[in-house]
A protein has these predicted regions:
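Basic, amphipathic DNA-recognition helix from helix-turn-helix-like DNA-binding domains
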Residues: 1-8
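Short strand-coil-strand connectors
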Residues: 8-10, 17, 24
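Short, surface-exposed charged micro-motifs
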Residues: 11-13, 85
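Positively charged, aromatic-enriched patches within helix-turn-helix-type DNA-binding elements
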Residues: 20-32, 36-73, 79-85, 90-92
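Short, cationic-aromatic polyanion-contact patches
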Residues: 95-98
Length: 98
């Protein structure tokens, strides 16, 4: 089977080959880290991901887990792809809604 190169979730399309993201068919520019974070969320739709999981996957273990870098990037992503798509699960982390 052909390798999946485009991830889709509720109006979002993320092309792993071209590193392009579309929201409802409109192209959106993301930084490399934003792209990685969105890719992680889109690979686990509906699943709650902890900040620690996000930190280790997107930034590597050399970042301080007490850092708010995940929250800052989630805010930036929400502005670009729509706040309603990324849900905060209090005390847990974040999840992507479909």
């Amino acid at each position: 089977p052909a390798e999946l190169t485009v991830l889709r979730a509720g109006g979002l399309a993320l092309d792993l080959r071209t590193r392009r993201v579309a929201v409802e068919e409109a192209s959106v520019d993301l930084t490399a880290r934003e792209f990685s974070l969105l890719e992680l969320l889109m690979r686990h739709p509906g699943q709650v991901l902890t900040r620690q999981q996000m930190l280790s996957h997107v930034w590597g273990y050399d970042y301080d887990p007490g850092s708010n870098v995940v929250d800052v990037f989630v805010r930036a992503l929400r502005r670009k792809v729509g706040a309603e798509r990324i849900v905060t699960v209090r005390g847990m982390g974040y999840r992507l809604t479909g």
